[in-house]
Structure formats: structure tokens, C-alpha cells
Amino acid sequence: MIIWKDTAKNMSLLSKSVPAKYAVDFEVPKGITEGYVTSDKKRFTYHVSISSVAPYSNESDVIQKKKSGLKSIMEIEKIQKIEPISIMEFRSSGKRIDELLTYAIAERETAEIREKYEYEKKVSSQVLDVIAEAKKLGYNIPESVAEEILRRKEEWGEKKYREILKRIGEEIQDELIDPYEAVGIIAAQSIGEPGTQMTMRTFHFAGVREMNVTLGLPRLIEIVDARRIPSTPSMTIYLKPEFETNDEVVMDVVKRLENTSVSDVADIITDIGELTITVRPDPNKMNDRLINQDDLVNAIYKVKGVTVMEESGQIIVKPQQESFKKLYLLQEQIKALPIKGISGIKRAIARVEGKEHRWVIYTQGSNLKDVLEVDEVDPTRTYTNDIVEIATVLGIEAARNAILNEAQRTLQEQGLNVDVRHLMLVADMMTFSGSVRAVGRTGISGRKSSVLARAAFEITTKHLLRAGIMGEVDKLAGVAENIIVGQPITLGTGAVDIIYKGYPKTKK
């Protein structure tokens, strides 16, 4: 297929004229039958079906892409406006295309969708028989427990097997939460009590300055508050199996990941008298970041409204409009000017882990979307501690698992053991609406349907005043609002109505 950049005006004209002949300023190989068109170099919004290709000739019924330099004529049979497709889905000669300037012969990557295995296919008929026998006794037992029972069935004998099966069913039944139990209160107490023993500390990567990871109580607060940006965002990046033991590839990936700006590799000197800015490269820093003089110069040439000169290895930049304000703004712009790397990744280090001596990359800063698009990175194992970013890139179910894993790991690092079911409840409540919501007045607690429950949490007068203006009605269906008005709560025994059936009166 062929992909090319075109104007929205041309595509609109083509859409009204198909089938039509379209003359373009590049050579289209014969045999091309389809193409995608972009107008912003990054996203493709049109799909075209091409019936034939011919060299350009001056014909009257041909729509022209531009007035001169035309080389080929495509006979376009059909054109369709589509949902935007990222340029990252296309490859040219096996390589990723970062930006499309004119055109390219490319192929589009497609995901292989495999059929999901049915649950029964994974489980042997003998295990299913054990589960069925337990159901006859009135108990539901997990598959893993049924497998363990089956392994020991011959050792126990038939009589003991049935006794143990019944006993296990009773134990599982006893472990189930009671109907109408206040699970939220239990979860809050079970997480909060050991949480008081947590320390407020930050882990520092040895030998690397400015490489810290927040742990303990501050990290737990970040998780339940659903902070948009964690205090110390970081990523754990795994490479594909064929690359993770190759030292050269790993170091190359590290350098490509680190976001390098001009201020990281050069000194910036402002001359107020001459109204110029001198960029003085530091050879040691440039070698460390695998950047050469051309990379630096090309980055500075992207700045608009300036004159760039090179003298004795230094780069002199002068604004075309001479003013102190312009000079100051230009200085700040050049300092932050990116040269290479991925936005958001401030630092990256590689460490050898495990008996097999496989490299793992750790970063300061996070950009999950762009990191996953690096060819050498294994997208199935790479991880970030930024939960909101996970929700944006991978979806709400992945964010739910991330909340659970991060909270569990934070507690375990402090030597605290909290039943995973309490953490699962918190993760479910934070994500069940389809977006990550905080446990607080800006999230779950602030969006309750009950006016009194919202007012009891925080900003009492604001909630009561707003409810009065809007004419809201509180049906007293929850816990907090019933406590406020002095009624029994709708949990535990308060959720059950007792029905008394009297004895019939007997005649004396």
C-alpha cells in the first residue's frame, strides 16, 4: 500500500469526484491497490481504493495534487473517511515511521486475534466431577482446591475423601462474608490500622543522583488519591527476549529513551550587550548522551524567528526582533529545546537482574505510550507506577490491576500483611465508573447521591446550600445519612425486616 500527505481541500474534491484520476508528485509503483492519506503527518483520516496506476500525462480530466512536478496518475475508485489511524501502525521496509513528509510505500501492522480457550477445556473431567460432587453437598469449591483433593483421593480412600470434601465445603462457607456486612468499614480498618505503622521514606537508587522512588505512607496516599502525576513517576522497562542480554542494544535503548534537551549537554550564555545567546557544547556530556554537533545544530535550527551562526564549535543565536524580552524568552526556549529521547523520561539506568543476567531498564519519569512504541521494548511486561497513565493507554481494567498491585507492593515493602480482598474492594470502587476516581471529596465520597452523606464528609455548608437550591431529595438509603437522623442503618441486622406471625387465637 502507499501512504501520502495531502491537503483537506484536495481530499474533499476527490470525495465528490470519485471515481476519478488523480495526479501526484511522486512515483507510484504498479500493483498498488490501496492507500491512506494524512493531512497532519501523524494521523491518517482517509482510505482510498486504487484501480490502476500510470505515468503522468497531460490529460484534461485529471485532478492535480499540485500545479507542477507531477509524476504519476492514480485512478481512484473509492475514497472513504475513516476514524484516525496513528502513523505508528505503519512500517516502511520493516522500520517505524515517525513522521510522514511526502509519501512512503508501507505495510500496516495488524494484531493477531486468537480464540479464547473455553474454561472446560483447561479442566480435566475428573476435577469437574469433584466440583460437581461438592455442589451436590451444597458447596462451591474453587478449581485449585478440587485439583488438590483429586491428587490425594486415592491416598485418603472413599470414606475419608467424602468427609474431607464436606469439611472443606464448610470451611469455605464459613469464610464467606455475611450478608449485609459493612465491608467498606472492615476494609478501611484493615488497611488503615497497619497503615499507621508505615514510615515516610523514599527509596534511592544507589550510584544515580536524582533517581528516587516514593514508598511507604506517601505512596499509599498517592494511590488512593488517584494523583494525576505521582511525586516520583518511574517505569520498569523489559526488553524482548532476543535483546535483553545484548549489552550494546540495551545501552543504545537507554540513550534513546532519555529525554535530552540543550541545557543537558551545553552551557547557555546570554550576551545582553550584543543581544545574542551562545550555546557552548560540553563534549563529555554529549558523548555520554550519544549526541553529536549536528544533532545540536539541527535542534536549534527548528527555533523560528532567529538567526543561527556557528563559530569555533560554538553556536550563536540572535533573535530577528531585538528586545530584552525576546532575548529572555529565547533563552528559556533554547534551554528546554529537546534534541532526542522520549518526552517525560528524565533519566534511565540499566541493571542486570536474575541468574540469567538479563538487563532491566529503570527510568525517572514516565511516558508509557511512547515507550511501548520502541521496537526493542517488550510491551507485555513493561510497567509504570503512574496509574492514571495506565488507564489512558491500556484501559480501566489495567488501571484497576495497577491500583491493586501498587497498594499491595507498598504495604509488603513495609512488612505489612493486608488481605488482598480489602485492596481489591478499594480498587474496584475507584474504577467501577469507568475512570479512576479518588477516595475523597473530589471522587467517590464527593459524588454520593445522598446530600447528608456528602455534607458529613467535607464542605458541609456548600453541599447543603447547593442541595437546597437544586431541590435535591435524600432518600436516607445509606449509612451516614441514617446515623445523622438517628435511624438504624441499612446494614447488618438493620437491613433485615423481622416478620412476626402470631399464633391463632383459641376459643376458651
UniProtKB/Swiss-Prot annotation:
Q: Which GO terms describe its biological process?
A: DNA-templated transcription
As its record notes, the protein acts as a catalyst of: RNA(n) + a ribonucleoside 5'-triphosphate = RNA(n+1) + diphosphate
User: Under which EC number(s) is this enzyme classified?
Assistant: 2.7.7.6
Question: Can you say where in the cell this protein is located?
Answer: Cytoplasm
Write one Pfam family the protein is assigned to: RNA_pol_Rpb1_5
Predominantly, its location class is cytoplasm
Region (DNA-directed RNA polymerase subunit Rpo1C) residue spans: 124-508
From the UniProt entry, list the residue stretches annotated as the region Unknown. Answer: 1-123
Q: What's a GO cellular component annotated to this UniProt protein?
A: cytoplasm
Keyword Protein biosynthesis in annotation: no
Q: Name one GO molecular function term.
A: DNA-directed RNA polymerase activity
| Keyword NADP in annotation | no
Cite the entry's keywords alphabetically.
Cytoplasm, DNA-binding, DNA-directed RNA polymerase, Nucleotidyltransferase, Transcription, Transferase
Q: How does it assemble?
A: Part of the RNA polymerase complex.
The free-text function statement in the UniProt record for this protein reads: DNA-dependent RNA polymerase (RNAP) catalyzes the transcription of DNA into RNA using the four ribonucleoside triphosphates as substrates. Forms part of the jaw domain.
What is the similarity comment for this entry? Belongs to the RNA polymerase beta' chain family.
**What name does this protein carry?**
DNA-directed RNA polymerase subunit Rpo1C
- Species for this entry: Thermoplasma volcanium (strain ATCC 51530 / DSM 4299 / JCM 9571 / NBRC 15438 / GSS1)
